[in-house]
């Protein structure tokens, strides 16, 4: 019998789903997904939707809390939804992430590979170096920052997001006060009226430099000189103030035109010793300290020797490969985004003549470039793969096998596609030695992982 809407069930939460919801089973065996619950919770759950083989519910009453449950220290954690695991002890969160990665490699990849304990983030809160606040109005009609409630474009005001450094929250609130005092209107999606759509902020984890970028419907910003003066007086680490223009009716945050009100238009920072310049469009890991831990694992798994050639596919701004440039003879990077390749070349140049001389970066589709390089006879000793969430296509993986590197290191933001690709490589002569989950997104369900693969059989 299907579950009925508003039906109440007493359920025990067994595990977490991929989106962080608790998973339980009805007496008839139907899976029920319940946000805001933890494994071990006994709860009264209200059914909101039955989809046949599974259903969705909400927590109506917590009967017996899980030992892994902790008090939630954010008033809007529920409606905001940005911290889907804020109610769980961090050690339990890490265990859950390890189990999720292990399940993907076992169930999707069919691989019997050691999945190590998840490495924690050095910072559990205030770890993000980037924030994109939509700008709306609070219940009194005043401009406010916040985040969209799940599956809506309704802004939940959030003056102090626990994932952002305090100074970024302070800047967002100060800007809203400036908007209110100067009659600057937030953008309204329904009417298409208003000026300010988003507040986009970056902060260098090591440099402390801050970029302020206001996403607006037009380039001319009223009281711009006064705005810059007020920001610089209150926040001395601000290095750039920008206007990004997005006049389209779209969910895409940034537009194509950016105007500088103050500073060079970017901030500077370092990642594993690699100097980087970050503008509004730069793709960059949002948790710098945990990313350095991730790259350290990747370097360890690469086992580079001084005579080696390293091929870095999906290289982005070149940070992974450049962080290992002193360990190899030659570095070749491939990335499809032109701006990222320009940044990679500039980053290499800033590291000095020796690194610049041994580094080559190409703007191309990773799979097509890999196939071309393989056909040209390139035989790198180590290949680094860091694909988007969809993973690698078969063209890329086939080219990797054709180039026959001694080792392959696969960095992934999606354990499911990583497991699939690792299984393909196993079928074509590579051995998955181990998988290291690394937590770059505490308080959320997301987890990165690094896979070490070697050519042929290895001693157990």
Task: For each feature predicted by the language model, list its residue ranges.
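Short, solvent-exposed loop/turn elements at beta->coil junctions and helix N-caps
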Residues: 117-124, 189-190, 198-202, 437-440
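Short, aliphatic-rich beta-strand segments
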Residues: 201, 207-217, 275-279, 382
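Short, acidic/hydrophobic/Gly-rich beta-strand patch recurrent on exposed beta strands
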Residues: 22-27, 146-149, 213-215, 344
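Terminal RNA-binding accessory module
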Residues: 1-72, 76, 109, 361, ...
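Residue-level signal for inorganic ion chemistry
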Residues: 24, 40, 83, 199, ...
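Short, conserved phosphate/pyrophosphate- and ester-handling motifs at nucleotide-, phospho-/glycolipid
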Residues: 40, 164, 287
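Rossmann-like S-adenosyl-L-methionine
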Residues: 2-7, 12, 18, 223-460
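Extended interfacial segments that mediate partner engagement and assembly in macromolecular machines
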Residues: 60-72, 78-186, 206, 221
């Amino acid at each position: 019998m299907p579950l009925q809407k508003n039906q109440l069930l007493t359920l025990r939460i067994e595990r977490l789903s991929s989106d962080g919801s608790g998973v339980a089973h009805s007496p008839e065996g139907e899976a029920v997904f319940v946000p805001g619950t933890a494994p071990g919770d006994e709860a009264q759950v209200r059914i909101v939707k039955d989809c046949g083989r599974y259903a969705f519910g909400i927590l109506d009453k917590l009967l017996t809390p899980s030992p892994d449950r902790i008090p939630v220290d954010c008033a809007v954690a529920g409606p905001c939804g940005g911290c889907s695991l804020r109610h769980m002890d961090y050690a339990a969160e890490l265990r859950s992430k390890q189990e999720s990665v292990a399940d993907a490699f076992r169930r999707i990849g069919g691989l019997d590979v050691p999945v190590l304990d998840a490495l924690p983030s050095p910072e559990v809160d205030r770890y993000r170096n980037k924030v994109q606040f939509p700008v709306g109005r609070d219940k009194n009609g005043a401009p406010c920052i916040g985040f969209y409630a799940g599956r809506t474009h309704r802004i939940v005001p959030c003056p102090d997001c626990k994932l952002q450094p305090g100074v970024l929250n302070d800047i967002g609130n100060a800007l809203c006060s400036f908007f209110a005092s100067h009659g600057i209107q937030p953008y309204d999606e329904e009417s298409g009226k208003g000026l300010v759509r988003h507040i986009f902020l970056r902060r260098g984890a090591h440099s402390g430099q801050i970029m302020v970028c206001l996403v607006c419907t037009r380039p001319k910003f009223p009281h711009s000189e006064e705005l810059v003066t007020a920001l610089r007086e209150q926040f001395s680490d601000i290095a750039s103030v920008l206007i990004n223009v997005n006049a389209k009716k779209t969910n895409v945050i940034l537009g194509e035109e950016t105007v500088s009100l103050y500073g060079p238009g970017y901030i500077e920072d370092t990642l594993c010793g690699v100097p980087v310049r970050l503008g509004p469009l730069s793709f960059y890991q949002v948790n710098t300290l945990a990313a350095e831990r991730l790259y350290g694992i990747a370097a360890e798994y690469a086992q580079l020797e001084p005579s080696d050639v390293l091929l870095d596919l999906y290289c982005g701004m070149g940070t992974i490969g450049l962080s290992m440039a002193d360990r190899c003879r030659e570095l070749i990077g491939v990335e499809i985004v032109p701006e990222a390749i320009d940044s990679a070349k500039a980053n290499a140049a800033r590291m000095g003549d020796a690194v610049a001389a041994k580094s080559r970066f190409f703007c191309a589709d990773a799979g097509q470039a890999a196939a071309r390089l393989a056909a040209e006879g390139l035989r790198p000793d180590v290949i680094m793969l860091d694909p988007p969430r969809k993973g690698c296509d078969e063209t890329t993986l086939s080219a990797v096998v054709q180039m026959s590197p001694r080792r392959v290191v696969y960095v992934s933001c999606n354990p499911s596609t990583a497991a699939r690709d690792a299984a393909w490589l196993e079928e074509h002569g590579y051995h998955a030695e181990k998988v290291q989950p690394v937590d770059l997104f505490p308080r959320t369900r997301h987890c990165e992982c690094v896979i070490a693969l070697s050519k042929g059989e290895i001693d157990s």
